[in-house]
Amino acid sequence: MKQVVQDLDVLPAAPTAAEKAACDLPRITEERNTGKQRKLYIESYGCQMNFSDSEIVMSILTEEGFDTTSTPNNADVILLNTCSIRDNAEQKVRHRLVHFKGLKRNKPSMIVGVLGCMAERLKAQLLEEEKIVDMVVGPDAYRDLPNLINEVDSGHKAVNVFLSREETYADINPLRLSGDGVSAFVSIMRGCDNMCSFCVVPYTRGRERSRDAHSILNEVRELVANGYKEVTLLGQNVDSYKWSAEGTDERVNFAQLLERVALVDPDLRVRFSTSHPKDITDEVLYTMKKYDNICNSIHLPAQSGNTRILELMNRTYTREWYMERITKIRQILGDDCGISSDTIAGFCSETEEEHQDTLSLMEFARFDFGYQFVYSERPGTPAAKKLADDVPEDVKQRRLSEIITVQRQLSLEHNQAQIGTIQKILIEGVSKKSEHDLKGRNSRNMMAIFPKKNYSKGQYVDVLITGCSGGTLFGEIVETV
């Protein structure tokens, strides 16, 4: 699962250096001042699951006497919710920690802590060797934060990176990071059992466990009651969601959960992320087709287009299997279904011919957009232990550039095909480029920009698409008389 930064007139799959820096910006806490004694500041990096976790942390700590601030200098507690998926993500956090260590010189009582995947992976280095944090807290230990903060207040370092087989935070009502009141993340499961050879997630987030379906539906109903118009169901692999009620015959798989959420309110848009190609079922696809409010968009990471490389990655499917899934999606949901992907360039021992297989798979699938990176070896993973990271860096970068070029063209063609059509858009807010324009997305997850007129966020509007760039649609609201 990768970070999505809205309102950028760029293609997420293919950023320039400046654009990529913008896409990697963290989400930070907003100002909330209710007169409480202490201030909390959180920076959240990486995937949507991290953003969702930060909302859980905010909820826990606001119950313990914290307001939130958007300014680190004003904070009593600074928390970085971190990502370990790539080395540069970790380096970015390290630079921020050094900066916050400087702030502590002027405010010695300030607590600096690391949450999330880096906490689990680098606890000893961060606490004992580099001495740049006061507290290290893993993804399953957020309930313990009040105790850990008290420990630091008492003059000690604090750590809890215990991985749970049960924790889902099902009973905690998240405090939303985004104040737009339109879209919200709803976590439905935690952890991952897939054990891809390149990935640290199973080691930093633990094994899969699914959240109580009733608590998910209660959270969705509360969001609707509070005026939210869109939810995104989150998990490292949502299609493997399986929950059963203890002592009863009730069993709920992902397709059934998706249907239950769709039935909460026909005006509530429902998205989900991320899907593993081996687990997305025809039942899920037919459920999407059945309900108009389930968005016609699927994030289906391919990672590579070559079967040998996929086997080395332990993805448990072949090129042909992935292509069959794409064909089935098109058969059931039509060519209007938006499909996006993740791709790794230059994985261990990848040949030029195997790289060409990835390019041809992209052409076959015709992805709307994607997130693509060069392979970054992560210590402790099976790939790091058993495979040589032997593709030269300049070759990785050249292959990434070729992947980006193909994706830019595919995305532009998809957007050009929308010109002249009328799209139902959910308004998410004012465009960052012009206060006179609004921004919003269609069911296919395409961003559109259009003149504001008398409309505002949270409304659905019909927009006639009149133009596009590689990453954005442009249009005019069609008003019915």
From Swiss-Prot:
Domain of life from the UniProt record: Bacteria
Q: What is its main location?
A: cytoplasm
Q: Which InterPro entries match?
A: Elp3/MiaA/NifB-like_rSAM, Methylthiotransferase, Methylthiotransferase_CS, Methylthiotransferase_N, Methylthiotransferase_N_sf, MiaB_methiolase, rSAM, rSAM_horseshoe
GO CC terms in record = cytosol
Cofactor(s) listed in the protein's UniProt record? [4Fe-4S] cluster
EC annotation from Swiss-Prot or TrEMBL: 2.8.4.3
Radical SAM core domain sequence ranges: 178-413
Domain TRAM as annotated: residue spans:
416-479
Localization of this protein:
Cytoplasm
UniProt-listed Pfam families: Radical_SAM (PF04055), TRAM (PF01938), UPF0004 (PF00919)
Q: Does the keyword ATP-binding apply?
A: no
- Keyword Cytoplasm among record annotations: yes
Signal peptide residues are none
* Cross-referenced Gene3D superfamilies: Methylthiotransferase, N-terminal domain (3.40.50.12160), tm_1862 like domain (3.80.30.20)
- Indicate which residues the UniProt annotation says bind [4Fe-4S] cluster 1: 47, 83, 117
Cofactor binding remark: Binds 2 [4Fe-4S] clusters. One cluster is coordinated with 3 cysteines and an exchangeable S-adenosyl-L-methionine.
Q: Which GO terms describe its molecular function?
A: 4 iron, 4 sulfur cluster binding; metal ion binding; N6-isopentenyladenosine methylthiotransferase activity
Question: What reaction does this enzyme carry out catalytically?
Answer: N(6)-dimethylallyladenosine(37) in tRNA + (sulfur carrier)-SH + AH2 + 2 S-adenosyl-L-methionine = 2-methylsulfanyl-N(6)-dimethylallyladenosine(37) in tRNA + (sulfur carrier)-H + 5'-deoxyadenosine + L-methionine + A + S-adenosyl-L-homocysteine + 2 H(+)
Assigned keywords, A-Z: 4Fe-4S, Cytoplasm, Iron, Iron-sulfur, Metal-binding, S-adenosyl-L-methionine, Transferase, tRNA processing
Ligand binding ([4Fe-4S] cluster 2)? 192, 196, 199
Q: Where is the MTTase N-terminal domain?
A: 38-154
Q: Which family does it belong to?
A: Belongs to the methylthiotransferase family. MiaB subfamily.
What job does this protein perform? Catalyzes the methylthiolation of N6-(dimethylallyl)adenosine (i(6)A), leading to the formation of 2-methylthio-N6-(dimethylallyl)adenosine (ms(2)i(6)A) at position 37 in tRNAs that read codons beginning with uridine.
Question: What does the subunit comment say?
Answer: Monomer.
Q: What is this protein called?
A: tRNA-2-methylthio-N(6)-dimethylallyladenosine synthase
Species annotation = Cytophaga hutchinsonii (strain ATCC 33406 / DSM 1761 / CIP 103989 / NBRC 15051 / NCIMB 9469 / D465)
GN (gene name): miaB
